[in-house]
């Protein structure tokens, strides 16, 4: 295939767009791959669409290889199936809702578990029909509160979502393993640097859950890896190793103290040191103090007006910050907000900066706590009065915890949950997520299948998603330099970019012959045949657009030499009569 730049619908930009924050956003816009329509909504221009179709082709090949069958559901969906699964409310404001002319509630699909489940229910009735794996590649819609980073986090995006249906849990394990391997094949073929991380299931529900995270400094997700072994997890899924419970016997009674100028953990620790207070014979540290973070929690609701907020508290050691993403994952599907001034005024028993767990118990405020706050541990915390703290407040004796959750930050150097080494922190971008959903949706939709004994049984499900548009942005993030994009062969819109920098007739004729020879060899060619564009502009555009191989017919062509630039790598001088063979060999790897 030959595409001429003189005919391609394309305009490159020399300056970064004003609203672009990350390299992928800047370069995809500058190189003419995408164009912004509205916040989080983008047009895919010819080059961008070709690259995205290449990614889809790789996904289809690997999905078909594990027995997946492609289908396509509508994006416009009725309310009722999502009402049955409770996700009409669980998705909250992230759901695009609308009404048709008859007043019926509709939505733009954020994901399609409900539709796949009802399709299987309506069409299959015997165990002989199973197992089955179905998938689609389709546009999804989520009303992100803060769309950012171009197509990395948009409100409209393309996903591959697949679903396995098995009659047994062992069958689900096999389907999950096949998908896991298929995902590894996809990311390996696309040359993405990624990590497979233990994850939470969130609103999707289910048990086993893993994320495929692309390693990137601009990633919104933090993940950890153990310095030894193969443990890796999204920070939201890291499980704190709780200490052993301690006997209350022999522990001194809690004592209140005046603590002037102790509004922060740092100043409280300094006060304790100055007062000569020790813990097991050592100086007090921030880890001996206990923060009481006030929050509000509400069950999911379709609108803000329907939410019923309840006061709650989160107790975490003073040497840790509150990690709102971990807290959100722990509370899902419920939502939370940090308590504001109005909440403190409304609940006069709360003394801001000096809240302690005793007053929370006394007023029936739900208390969540970090797993380190086990029974028998002793803490320095607020005494529910200005400039006062209590020393030696013992969990389980002086206050109680309603529920232990993961809400404290994970730190570099924390012990690895697998017991092998310590944790290192990295940033990543979620590309894929696989879940063992179990029977959450098949039970919700009363999917009844006759098993081999003629008895009714409920099949079990797996859910597997890949962000197609996000994958393109990730490749732009991971594979670029100061000159522009640098696509792998499997994704590049064209495999070879040919530019004629010498304007004499012989070079122009040779350029035409070269692209025709490349086309006959089955190589996809982008041909810069623009007659009134300088060689310098052609070179800059070639590097910006990012095709893996750039063939230049320049001054050396008079001696029968074509300059071959391997994008992001070496430059070779190749005899014109062997350039097609050289490129064919390079493309085949």
UniProtKB/Swiss-Prot annotation:
InterPro entries: aa-tRNA-synt_IIb, aa-tRNA-synth_II, aa-tRNA-synth_II/BPL/LPL, Anticodon-bd, Anticodon-bd_dom_sf, Pro-tRNA-ligase_IIa, Pro-tRNA-synth_IIa_bac-type, Pro-tRNA-Synthase_IIa_type1. GO terms for biological process: prolyl-tRNA aminoacylation. The keyword rRNA-binding does not apply. Keywords: Aminoacyl-tRNA synthetase, ATP-binding, Cytoplasm, Ligase, Nucleotide-binding, Protein biosynthesis. GO terms for molecular function: aminoacyl-tRNA deacylase activity; ATP binding; proline-tRNA ligase activity. It comes from the Bacteria. Its EC number is 6.1.1.15. It catalyses: tRNA(Pro) + L-proline + ATP = L-prolyl-tRNA(Pro) + AMP + diphosphate. Coiled coil: none annotated. It is found in: Cytoplasm. GO terms for cellular component: cytosol. It holds the Pfam family tRNA-synt_2b. CDD domains: ProRS_anticodon_short (cd00861), ProRS_core_prok (cd00779). Belongs to the class-II aminoacyl-tRNA synthetase family. ProS type 1 subfamily. PANTHER family: MITOCHONDRIAL RIBOSOME PROTEIN L39/PROLYL-TRNA LIGASE FAMILY MEMBER, PROLINE--TRNA LIGASE. Catalyzes the attachment of proline to tRNA(Pro) in a two-step reaction: proline is first activated by ATP to form Pro-AMP and then transferred to the acceptor end of tRNA(Pro). As ProRS can inadvertently accommodate and process non-cognate amino acids such as alanine and cysteine, to avoid such errors it has two additional distinct editing activities against alanine. One activity is designated as 'pretransfer' editing and involves the tRNA(Pro)-independent hydrolysis of activated Ala-AMP. Homodimer. Consists of three domains: the N-terminal catalytic domain, the editing domain and the C-terminal anticodon-binding domain. HAMAP family: Pro_tRNA_synth_type1. This is Proline--tRNA ligase.
């Amino acid at each position: 295939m030959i595409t001429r730049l003189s005919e391609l619908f394309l305009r490159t930009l020399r300056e970064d767009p004003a609203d672009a924050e990350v390299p992928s956003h800047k370069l995809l816009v500058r190189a003419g791959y995408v164009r912004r329509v509205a916040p989080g909504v983008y047009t895919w221009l010819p080059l961008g669409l070709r690259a995205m179709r290449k990614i889809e082709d790789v996904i289809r090949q690997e999905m078909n290889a594990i027995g997946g069958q492609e289908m396509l559901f509508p994006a416009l969906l009725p309310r009722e199936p999502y009402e049955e699964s409770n996700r009409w409310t669980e998705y909250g404001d992230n759901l695009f809702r609308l009404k048709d002319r008859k007043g019926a509630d509709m939505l733009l699909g954020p994901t399609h578990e409900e539709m796949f489940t009802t399709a299987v229910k309506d069409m299959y009735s015997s165990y002989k029909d199973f197992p089955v794996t179905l998938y689609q590649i389709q546009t999804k819609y989520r009303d992100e509160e803060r769309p950012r980073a171009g197509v990395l986090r948009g409100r409209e995006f393309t996903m591959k979502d697949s679903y396995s249906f098995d009659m047994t849990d062992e069958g689900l394990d096999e389907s999950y393993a096949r998908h896991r391997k298929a995902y590894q094949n996809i990311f390996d073929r696309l040359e993405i640097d990624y990590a497979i991380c233990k994850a939470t299931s969130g609103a999707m529900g289910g048990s086993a859950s893993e994320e495929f995270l692309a390693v990137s400094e601009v990633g919104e997700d933090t993940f950890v890896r153990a310095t030894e072994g193969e443990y890796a997890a999204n920070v939201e899924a890291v499980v704190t190793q709780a200490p052993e419970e301690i006997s209350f016997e022999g522990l001194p009674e809690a004592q209140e103290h005046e603590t002037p100028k102790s509004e922060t953990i740092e100043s409280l620790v300094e006060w304790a040191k100055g007062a000569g207070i020790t813990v097991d014979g050592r100086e007090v540290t921030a880890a001996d103090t206990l923060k009481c973070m006030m929050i509000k929690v509400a069950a999911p609701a379709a609108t803000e007006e329907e939410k019923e907020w309840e006061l709650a508290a989160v107790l975490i050691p003073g040497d840790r910050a509150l990690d709102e993403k971990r807290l959100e994952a722990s509370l899902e599907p419920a939502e939370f907000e940090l308590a504001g001034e109005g909440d403190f005024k409304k609940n006069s028993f709360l003394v801001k900066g000096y809240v302690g767990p005793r007053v929370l118990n006394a007023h029936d405020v739900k208390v969540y706590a970090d797993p380190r706050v086990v029974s028998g541990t002793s803490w320095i915390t607020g005494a529910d009065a200005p400039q006062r703290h209590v020393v030696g407040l013992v969990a389980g004796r002086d206050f109680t915890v309603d529920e232990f959750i993961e809400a404290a930050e994970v730190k570099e150097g924390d012990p690895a949950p697998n017991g092998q080494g310590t944790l290192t922190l990295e940033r990543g971008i979620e590309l894929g997520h696989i879940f063992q959903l179990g029977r959450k949706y098949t039970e919700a939709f009363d999917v009844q299948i006759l098993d081999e004994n003629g008895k009714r049984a409920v099949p079990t499900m797996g859910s597997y998603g890949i962000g197609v548009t996000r994958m393109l942005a990730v490749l732009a993030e991971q594979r670029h330099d100061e000159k522009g994009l640098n696509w792998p062969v499997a994704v590049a819109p064209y495999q070879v970019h040919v530019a004629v920098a010498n304007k004499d007739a012989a070079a122009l004729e040779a350029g035409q012959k070269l692209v025709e020879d490349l086309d006959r060899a089955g190589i996809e060619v982008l041909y810069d045949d623009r007659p009134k564009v300088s060689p310098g502009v052609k070179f800059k555009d070639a590097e910006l657009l990012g095709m893996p191989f750039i063939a230049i017919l320049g001054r050396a062509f008079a001696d029968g030499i074509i300059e071959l630039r391997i994008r992001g790598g070496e430059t070779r001088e190749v005899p014109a009569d062997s350039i097609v063979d050289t490129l064919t060999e390079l493309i085949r790897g």
